[in-house]
Curated annotation (Swiss-Prot):
Similarity comment text for this entry: Belongs to the herpesviridae NEC1 protein family.
Protein name per the record: Nuclear egress protein 1
Key word Phosphoprotein present: yes
One Pfam family matching this protein: Herpes_UL31
Main location: host cell
Keyword Manganese (UniProt): no
Gene assigned in the entry: NEC1
Length: 259
């Protein structure tokens, strides 16, 4: 054990001597060292302590400010997102005080829900309100399951949001408007959203007093998943949209482009 520990200390000091910025090899090695071993390295080579801190992705507080709009592809793994009027931050999961025991659906769970959606129209009615009964948008959704999957995943962490579908460049896109300026998105929720978002740009923005998730389609990927769009369309057309939801759509038309 003593020999192995010595070898790892030498390897750590060798990597820390390099002047290159953060790299995966350094991080993997530093994570494999115990606190006692790291302390030994820093005791022998005090100048390496600063290098070690510089190569960390997040500050020692476990928090890092983000710029709005924020592209979710820039999200650090194992970090949550905290947005509020006071700060917009990525927060290390180990330092997060807002994560509860919420069960986040996986990408596979969301796809199963998409395939079974005709049997659960009322359960997911908020999603269908977002089409505003526009037939062409409803039919486009049959080729883009990603939008439903993202809605389904987000439904596990929030209820005070409104999806809005719109067409741009012959592709279906979605805004998700959170009717609040305070929002916590757990890291697992972000991971699952990014898993289903191939071919999409997903951005977080703040407009007026709302947080808005932009789900913008770049390319439509071929899917073998089929749903009976005629049955779904009929059910959506028969659905009553509450006046409150209709009023919100009218207000958002003055804020959001393309709708």
């Amino acid at each position: 054990m003593a020999i192995q520990s010595t070898r790892r200390l030498r390897r750590a000091s060798s990597l820390l001597k390099k002047s290159k910025p953060y790299n995966k090899e350094k991080t993997n090695l530093s994570l494999s060292l115990s606190l006692k071993e790291l302390h030994s390295v820093f005791k022998l080579f005090p100048e390496y302590e600063l290098k070690f801190l510089n190569m960390m992705k997040l500050p020692i507080t476990g928090k890092e400010p983000i710029k709005i709009p924020f592209d979710l592809s820039l999200h650090h793994q194992h970090t949550c997102l905290d947005l509020s009027p006071y700060a917009n931050e990525q927060v290390s999961k180990s330092a997060c005080v807002n994560c509860g025991t919420t069960n986040i659906p996986t990408a596979s769970d969301a796809m199963v829900a998409y395939m079974n959606q005709i049997s659960n129209v009322m359960q997911n009615r908020l999603y269908y309100y977002g089409f505003q009964k526009k037939v062409e948008l409803i039919r486009m959704s049959a080729k883009q399951p990603t939008l439903f999957q993202i809605f389904y995943i987000l439904s596990s962490i929030a209820s005070n949001f409104l999806p809005i579908m719109f067409e741009n460049n012959e592709k279906l896109n979605m805004y998700v408007v959170f009717q609040t300026r305070t929002l916590h998105i757990p890291c697992e929720c972000i991971n699952q959203i990014m898993t289903v978002s191939s071919g999409y740009t997903v951005l977080l923005d703040i407009l007026h007093d709302s947080i808005v998730l932009h789900v913008l389609c770049k390319t439509i990927e071929t899917s073998n998943i089929q749903i009976d769009i005629n049955v779904l369309q009929r059910k959506i057309e028969e659905m009553d949209v509450p006046d409150e939801i209709g009023d919100k759509f009218e207000k958002l038309k003055h804020i959001l482009p393309f709708i």
